């Protein structure tokens, strides 16, 4: 009797491990799906090397490609999923750096960060023409313990918006 219980336990444990491994692999694959297509398109649009590719979710899905052009200058590309013919490319020095954005949010009086969760390049494609632009998105916990999204234009630190949600 103890042998049957032990074998059943081992089988259940193996099933659980295999299921967890499958779910983990599937989730990771969804996160990086499309990166190879983005890399290929970026190379066709002037990227000599690729340092990083990230997926950004807004109204649409965007691939953010960071690398260098043939002159060795750091460049960033924003490509909408499924649109490999059109990539918005800017030199990194034309916009705000990650450090610039971190400094900017430290100066916000009513919503200073207590803990930064994530900072990443993205693309805001909301219905307003003002917001059809490359952006930096910062997710953080503010001093009032709210989960806050701070979205600022990649090229103009005066253009930003902020949302706070109670945890």
Segments (PLM) and residue ranges:
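A short acidic/small-residue loop/turn micro-motif
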Residues: 166-167
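Short, solvent-exposed secondary-structure boundary motifs
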Residues: 44-46, 55-57, 140-144
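Extracytoplasmic/periplasmic/luminal assembly and interaction segments
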Residues: 51-96
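Short, non-transmembrane alpha-helical segments in secretory-pathway proteins
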Residues: 22-53, 89-130
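Hydrophobic membrane-insertion alpha-helices, especially the h-region
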Residues: 4-23
């Amino acid at each position: 009797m103890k042998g049957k219980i032990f074998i059943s336990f081992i089988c259940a444990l193996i099933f659980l491990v295999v299921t967890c491994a499958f779910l983990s692999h599937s989730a990771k694959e969804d996160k990086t799906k499309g990166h190879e297509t983005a890399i290929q398109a970026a190379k066709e649009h002037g990227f000599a090397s690729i340092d990083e590719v990230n997926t950004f979710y807004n109204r649409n899905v965007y691939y953010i490609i960071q690398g260098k052009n043939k002159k060795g200058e750091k460049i960033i590309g924003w490509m909408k999923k499924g649109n490999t013919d059109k990539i918005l490319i800017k030199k990194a020095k034309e916009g705000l750096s990650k450090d610039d954005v971190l400094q900017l949010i430290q100066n916000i009086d009513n919503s200073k960060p207590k803990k930064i969760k994530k900072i990443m390049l993205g693309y805001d494609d909301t219905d307003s023409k003002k917001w059809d632009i490359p952006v930096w998105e910062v997710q953080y916990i503010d001093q009032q313990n709210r989960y806050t999204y701070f979205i600022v234009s990649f090229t103009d630190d005066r253009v930003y918006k902020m949302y706070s949600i109670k945890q």
